[in-house]
């Protein structure tokens, strides 16, 4: 069986075409903002290379040249790890005014399409993860599960009336009913909001997901033009695609979780340290920034020895899993205040 293809992505927005990204803040076309994500990219591939040395690694982006960050030669680092960089245009870019935030998220649909078309064989597994995800263990069990199920999905544990990017699952269900031909009043079970931080599956299933998403996108554009409820971001749309294809929900839950580590609303808990992948939205400007320094230093603890339990404990202490230490709390507070001053508006 072929090695998995592990990918992440970054779409750099242009001046005048910015969107809103609340977890980072600031102007999305600025060097400051984009450096936050490039640091995440470095950490993503560094961690995966440590625990998945035999995997294929690929970066999708719209930039022609990967920039240096903080004086660090990002492109050379990725080349040393054997990361393939694919410059991919944004074919699924929503029109201006489609939704007020997260305008780059539909880029994932283009990434999934390209990934499905380039996997080497029918049993090959590819995965697309957000760049603020960190591998802590080898991906073998996740890959085996993807072959078994065809695709893996993460139940993001969003309540029926909890809004996620402008829609609650109950409101999503009304759109499902219309798309399924039953009309908005058809009712039915409230659907599960499937997290968009992971799209993983075999070549055949990823191709089916891409086909279904491509077929659905014109309807979303029509609804936008008509002022009708629509899927505002890729996770809304992919949740419906999984529903339509009969792909079960929650098969990725044993491997990955969305872990909030902010000063308020934290969801991190004991047991998270045992997961294969940590998705850490709140650590983009905090722990992942410090991890970037370690990953960029070939003599640091990050590259020393084998990625064993001691390595994972050091990783967890840096990223706040399974909890924030007093030292990390103090460093995070200082960084959060500094970011408020330095962040371009």
Name what the model sees in each region:
Residues 66, 70-120:
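Active-site-proximal specificity loops/subdomain of glycosyltransferases
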Residues 131-133:
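Short acidic donor-binding/metal-coordinating loop in glycosyltransferase active sites
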Residues 135-174:
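Conserved donor-nucleotide/metal-binding helix-loop-beta segment in metal-dependent transferases, i.e.
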Residues 126:
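Short aromatic/hydrophobic "clamp" motif used to bind/position activated sugar donors
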Residues 180-283:
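Catalytic core and acceptor-binding pocket of nucleotide-sugar-dependent glycosyltransferases
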Residues 263-345:
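Long, low-complexity C-terminal extensions of enzymes
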Residues 47-55:
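Short, acidic, metal-binding catalytic loop of nucleotide-sugar glycosyltransferases
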Residues 1-43:
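N-proximal low-complexity "stem/linker" segments adjacent to membrane-targeting elements
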């Amino acid at each position: 069986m072929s090695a998995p293809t592990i990918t992440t992505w970054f779409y750099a927005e242009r001046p005048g075409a910015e969107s809103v990204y609340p977890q980072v803040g600031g102007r999305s076309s600025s060097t400051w903002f984009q450096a936050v994500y490039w640091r995440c990219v470095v950490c993503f591939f560094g961690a995966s290379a440590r625990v998945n040395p035999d995997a294929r690694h690929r970066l999708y982006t719209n930039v022609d040249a990967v920039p240096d960050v903080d004086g660090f030669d990002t492109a050379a680092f990725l080349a040393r790890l054997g990361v393939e960089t694919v410059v991919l245009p944004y074919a699924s870019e929503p029109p201006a005014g489609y939704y007020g935030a997260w305008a780059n998220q539909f880029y994932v649909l283009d990434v999934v399409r390209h990934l499905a078309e380039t996997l080497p064989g029918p049993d090959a597994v590819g995965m697309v993860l957000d760049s603020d995800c960190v591998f802590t263990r080898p991906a073998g069990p996740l890959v085996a599960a993807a072959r078994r199920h065809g695709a893996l999905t993460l139940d993001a544990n969003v309540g029926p009336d909890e809004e996620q990017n402008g829609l609650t699952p109950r409101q999503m269900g009304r759109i499902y009913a219309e798309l399924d031909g039953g009309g908005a009043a058809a009712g039915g079970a409230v659907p599960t909001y499937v997290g968009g931080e992971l799209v993983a599956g075999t070549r055949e299933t990823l191709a089916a997901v891409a086909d279904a998403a491509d077929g659905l996108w014109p309807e979303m554009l029509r609804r936008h033009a008509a002022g009708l409820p629509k899927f505002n971001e890729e996770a809304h749309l992919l949740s419906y695609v999984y529903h339509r294809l009969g792909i079960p929900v929650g098969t990725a839950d044993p491997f990955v979780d969305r872990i909030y580590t902010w000063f308020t609303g934290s969801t991190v808990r004991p047991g998270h340290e045992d997961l294969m992948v940590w998705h850490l939205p709140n650590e983009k400007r905090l722990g992942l920034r410090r991890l970037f320094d370690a990953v960029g230093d070939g003599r640091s603890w990050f590259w020393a020895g084998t990625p064993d339990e001691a390595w994972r404990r050091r990783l967890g202490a840096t990223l706040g899993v399974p909890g924030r230490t007093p030292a990390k709390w103090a460093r995070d507070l200082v960084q959060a205040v500094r970011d408020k001053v330095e962040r371009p508006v």
